[in-house]
């Protein structure tokens, strides 16, 4: 919820009111729900054609039009299509979640209108990355939102108000000290200070490769160097295009 609020505020919305999730709202009748909106002086409602409200989704977009005679404008939007792997689908939260599960990160980001993000507190790890020259900021997977598939991602990371290019691994680092749980590890390029305890935001740009168990530490280091060079080159090219 906090991440959604940040996205909405960054889009220019000045104030957010989150509808309380309680029986009186979830199981309300159509009229009770409409009165709830009227009592809060709602002046404009924008919903998709598949929007439902009230007990068991009894309320439909056309029911909202009843409030137009009370000075509330109602806009009902058509659902847009997108094509993925030769199949047309309606843009929906379910479709986006499926794309994320299928490693279709770039397509999911297009539909979201912004990159998938993960905000969390940096926790202490085994410092294995630091030992081979690639220190990471570690976070636990989110409990209340979909976690991306295991693998390596191109990311950018927000640390104390500044964005840095970065590489993120989601998995159990099988080459060194394989874990029995999934960790989100981000190697942030250009940050050389202690991040433990800080809240950071990782923005996921592109899926790079599957999690791989390398034959040796040297093979792993060579691959990480190659990925770093590729990510930094891409970041520089993006900066030039924006200039």
Task: Name every feature range the model reports, one short phrase each.
Residues 8, 45, 108, 155, ...:
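Residue-level signal for inorganic ion chemistry
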Residues 1-69:
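N-terminal Rossmann-like or analogous alpha/beta NTP/dinucleotide-binding catalytic cores
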